[in-house]
Every structure is written in C-alpha cells, then in structure tokens.
C-alpha cells in the first residue's frame, strides 16, 4: 500500500537485466501535500522521493521493505510537480544472503538528476 495515496503513479517499469530496472513515475501536482510544501511554489519533499523509491522496489521485489541504512543520499535539484511531473528512476537492486537489498538509485526530472541514493533495504 502507498503511504501517500494519489501522490504518484508508475506509468512504466522495465527490467533491463538481472539487477537493473528503469521506472517511470508521474507525480500528481494536485496532491494536498503541496498546499504546505509549498503554497504557490510546490516542491516534492525529499522524504517523499525516498518513499517513492522504496515503494517501487517493494513492487519489484513483491515484498514489504524498510530502509536499514542510507549510506549516501544527495538531493541535486528541486522538483516542481507542475513543471516536471515525470520522473525517471534508474534502480540497481542486489540481494545479499542476509535478505538485505543493496540499492543504487538515481532519479531524473526533465534531464536533471534530482536524487542519488545508496542504501540498504531489509524485509519488514
């Protein structure tokens, strides 16, 4: 289940190879979260980007997951959902013996890299 219903929808998901996926996401610029973040100048909250990435990986793995560790997370550009509602997520997912998933994620909005993430997810 999505933490924020109607915040985004996956429009395309492609399995590139054993560990790599590309997921296209369409943000909903009308979502109520933007009334507070921020009025007249909507910006996707960074924590919501982390949630979108986690939920996309949960769908791919067909299992509930949670962040175990975030080794690095860089927010490189602001996403205004009115101007650039489409996101492209490049995901590398490697499963360890311990049921931990090593994640490399990069999000691109209108040709600008908006997030780079290196993290570990683990089953709930």
Where are these regions (language model features)?
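Catalytic strand-loop segment that frames the active site of acyl-thioester-processing enzymes
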Residues: 2-44
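Extracellular/lumenal ectodomain signal focusing on beta-strand-rich modules
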Residues: 12, 69-72, 116
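Hydrophobic residues in beta-strands and at strand termini
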Residues: 27, 75, 121-123
């Amino acid at each position: 289940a999505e933490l924020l219903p109607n915040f985004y929808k996956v429009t395309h998901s492609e399995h590139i190879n054993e560990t790599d996926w590309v997921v296209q996401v369409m943000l909903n610029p009308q979502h109520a979260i933007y009334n507070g973040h921020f009025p007249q100048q909507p910006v996707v909250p960074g924590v919501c980007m982390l949630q979108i990435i986690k939920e996309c990986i949960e769908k791919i793995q067909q299992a509930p997951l949670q962040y175990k560790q975030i080794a690095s997370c860089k927010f490189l550009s602001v996403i205004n959902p009115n101007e650039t509602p489409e996101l492209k997520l490049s995901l590398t997912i490697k499963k360890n013996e311990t049921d931990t998933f090593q994640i490399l994620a990069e999000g691109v909005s209108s040709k600008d890299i908006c997030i780079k993430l290196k993290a570990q997810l683990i089953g709930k």
